[in-house]
């Protein structure tokens, strides 16, 4: 028989830097989950990633105080800002441009994000990434 699910917890945690302090500790503590067990498992799974890169994670909490978690790909905005070498997007995205990325960079980001996107093929995923970049004030050359 399947375990009874008591809830889902969605967090964004920097890769390799999960610790019991907020937001991780309170979110897991109120469901009665073992915080250190999650932190060790999360840090072990993200040790191959770039340290500090925010990783969305969905934790499934069960009634017997056990849990499982699924890691998603880093947010597209973070990957776009890294590719464009900017700290933040434009406050007026359609008038002030803060940087640009090439189509090749957009394709690389789309390949990374493909498991989490609803796009049917790579070209549709590239257009999705290009739209996100435009809404941040970053131009995409060749799209």
From Swiss-Prot:
What SUPFAM superfamilies does its record include?
Answer: Ribosomal L11/L12e N-terminal domain (SSF54747), Ribosomal protein L11, C-terminal domain (SSF46906)
Q: Which InterPro entries does this UniProt record tie to the protein?
A: Ribosomal_uL11 (IPR000911), Ribosomal_uL11_bac-typ (IPR006519), Ribosomal_uL11_C (IPR020783), Ribosomal_uL11_C_sf (IPR036769), Ribosomal_uL11_CS (IPR020785), Ribosomal_uL11_N (IPR020784), Ribosomal_uL11_N_sf (IPR036796)
Q: Name one GO molecular function term.
A: large ribosomal subunit rRNA binding
Q: Please provide one cellular component term from the Gene Ontology annotations of this protein.
A: cytosolic large ribosomal subunit
Listed under GO biological process in this entry are: translation
The lineage's top-level taxon is Bacteria
Mod. after translation: One or more lysine residues are methylated.
Q: Which UniProt keyword terms apply here? A: Methylation, Ribonucleoprotein, Ribosomal protein, RNA-binding, rRNA-binding
State the function annotated in the UniProt record. Answer: Forms part of the ribosomal stalk which helps the ribosome interact with GTP-bound translation factors.
The record's PANTHER family line, in alphabetical order, gives: 60S RIBOSOMAL PROTEIN L12, LARGE RIBOSOMAL SUBUNIT PROTEIN UL11M
The record's similarity note reads: Belongs to the universal ribosomal protein uL11 family.
- What is annotated about its quaternary structure and interactions? Part of the ribosomal stalk of the 50S ribosomal subunit. Interacts with L10 and the large rRNA to form the base of the stalk. L10 forms an elongated spine to which L12 dimers bind in a sequential fashion forming a multimeric L10(L12)X complex.
What protein name does the entry list?
Large ribosomal subunit protein uL11
Task: Please tell me the species this chain comes from.
Answer: Burkholderia cenocepacia (strain HI2424)
Q: What gene does the UniProt entry assign to this protein?
A: rplK
